[in-house]
Curated annotation (Swiss-Prot):
SMART domains for the chain: Ribosomal_L14
GO molecular function, one term: large ribosomal subunit rRNA binding
Keyword line: Ribonucleoprotein, Ribosomal protein, RNA-binding, rRNA-binding
Pfam families reported in the protein's UniProt record: Ribosomal_L14
Subunit: Part of the 50S ribosomal subunit. Forms a cluster with proteins L3 and L19. In the 70S ribosome, L14 and L19 interact and together make contacts with the 16S rRNA in bridges B5 and B8.
Signal sequence coordinates: none
Task performed by this protein: Binds to 23S rRNA. Forms part of two intersubunit bridges in the 70S ribosome.
UniProt record similarity statement: Belongs to the universal ribosomal protein uL14 family.
Name used for this protein in its record: Large ribosomal subunit protein uL14
């Protein structure tokens, strides 16, 4: 469950290490974002020589959350950290590698490229 001012780790190789959520996309009254939702964020910490710089405004899709997510079969899934992947305007990832597991819900939300790059889909 991500909201404004939430900080997330980055699970790709764009050079960003941490982002801060500015806005949850999907309507003016939408407060929270879960796995597979798109947010607008600013880069708070970045590695030197990366594709993105500190202070840059980016779009990102959430791939892991600490808050559990309920699935259709009644099971719940949660992760150890809140993490996101930086995406372009056409919902393709900006990086070429994804680190750590991602949730199966991304496949239903049509983020196929992220699912195919991920080392593990849970």
């Amino acid at each position: 469950m991500i909201q404004q001012e939430s900080r997330l780790k980055i699970a790709d190789n764009t050079g960003a290490r941490e982002i801060l959520c500015i806005r949850v996309l999907g309507g003016s009254t939408r407060r929270f974002a879960g796995i597979g939702d798109v947010i607008v964020a600013t880069v708070k910490e970045a590695a030197p020589g990366g594709n993105v710089k500190s202070g840059e405004i980016v779009k990102a899709v959430i791939v892991r959350t600490k808050k559990e997510t309920r699935r259709a079969d009644g099971s719940y899934i949660s992760f150890d950290e809140n993490a996101a992947v930086i995406i372009k305007n056409d919902n393709e990832p900006r990086g070429t590698r994804i680190f750590g597991p991602v949730a199966r819900e991304l496949r239903e939300k049509k983020f196929m490229k992220i699912v195919s790059l991920a080392p593990e889909v849970i």
